[in-house]
Amino acid sequence: MVTRLLLATCNARKLDELRRILAASGVDGLQVLGLADVPEFPQAPETEPTFEGNALAKARDAAAATGLPAVADDSGLVVDALGGMPGVLSARWAGRHGDDVANLRLVLDQLTDVPEARRGAAFVCAAALVLPAGREQVVLGEWRGALVREPRGVNGFGYDPIFVPEGEQRTAAELDPSEKDAVSHRGRALRALLPALRAVCGLPGALPGALPG
């Protein structure tokens, strides 16, 4: 039996990454759909003050509108020297949603006088799974590192070109996709949802109490 799962995102690069992570997870019986595969519906605005709140709002709307189990994520960059910002505002930090170059340049400008020892940061991802019947689960993944002064690399998206993960010399944008998926905030969050996804598919390996039970 195949279970259809909706990944509720309009970001094509994020959708590719989510699909890639799920494909490598070994959960059989999932047909992964994107928003382009279902009728259009009004999507929740990202107005919650937390990553978890935004992820849940998007997944709830998607599950209610389509009748499908839905996974949504909200993620962003948390910069120590900026008091945790841009945080949930990461995608629109420079004012326009999804302008990766402007967002990245603004963060670098704000950190111009910050020394290397204080350029710590983390990528954070909240991933939410919501079933049409109303059951839901939300998990967090975090990826710590530091910010360099100039972008490097052509892979990834968002702030990847300025983020060097702990234990690495390369930026996230210099990692191969499979390398990034194995350690990234989004990879960690989705892997934390695997017991619930296995339960949705009726597969062994679901934890007691995982969705749907």
Where in this protein do the model-derived segments appear?
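Anionic-ligand binding patches
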Residues: 2-6, 12-213
